[in-house]
């Protein structure tokens, strides 16, 4: 971590260690096991893992369950789309409420269109990048 240049490597080392310890002690605490309550599960994971907020945990759940995850990675681009680019939501109850309202709005509208939330977010991101598909970045996930 120190040589990666990500910064805060002392904290990150501790956070990764704590996450690994908790995960391997009870992996099911981190699984989406039902078709609903994804936001509740995400929030419980956020409470367990120091150093990760709603957007990062949502991103992981989106990547693991791209067709069914009912959470939204509210990154800067998503926040900007909703006119909330300065929203602080990880340490603010009011901010978290606004984040969840945005997330619900996005999920409901994706559901109406019968497009998985994550897929719609990827299409939006590709459009921002002026790309027709995700191959410009997704190649890094291939073996």
Residues covered by each model-derived region:
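A basic, often C-terminal nucleic-acid-binding module that engages the phosphate backbone, implemented
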Residues: 21, 92-143
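Residue-level detector of well-ordered alpha-helical segments, enriched
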Residues: 11-15, 56, 119-120
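Catalytic DNA-binding helix-loop module of base-excision-repair DNA glycosylases/AP lyases
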Residues: 32-92, 121-128
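Hydrophobic (often cysteine-bearing) scaffold residues that line and stabilize catalytic clefts
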Residues: 12, 74, 98, 102
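Hydrophobic alpha-helix position signal
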Residues: 1, 79-82, 110
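Alpha-helical ds-nucleic-acid-binding substructure associated with the helix-hairpin-helix region
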Residues: 1-51
């Amino acid at each position: 971590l120190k040589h990666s240049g990500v910064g805060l490597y002392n904290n990150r080392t501790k956070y990764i260690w704590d996450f690994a310890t908790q995960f391997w002690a009870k992996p099911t605490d981190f699984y989406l096991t039902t078709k609903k309550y994804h936001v509740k599960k995400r929030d419980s994971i956020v409470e367990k893992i120091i150093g990760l907020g709603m957007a990062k945990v949502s991103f992981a759940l989106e990547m693991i369950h791209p067709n069914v995850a009912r959470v939204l990675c509210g990154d800067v681009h998503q926040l900007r789309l909703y006119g909330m680019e300065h929203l602080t939501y990880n340490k603010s109850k009011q901010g978290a409420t606004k984040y969840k309202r945005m997330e619900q709005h996005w999920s409901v509208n994706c559901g109406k269109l019968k497009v998985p939330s994550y897929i719609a977010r990827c299409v939006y991101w590709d459009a921002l990048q002026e790309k027709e598909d995700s191959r410009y970045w997704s190649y890094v996930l291939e073996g």
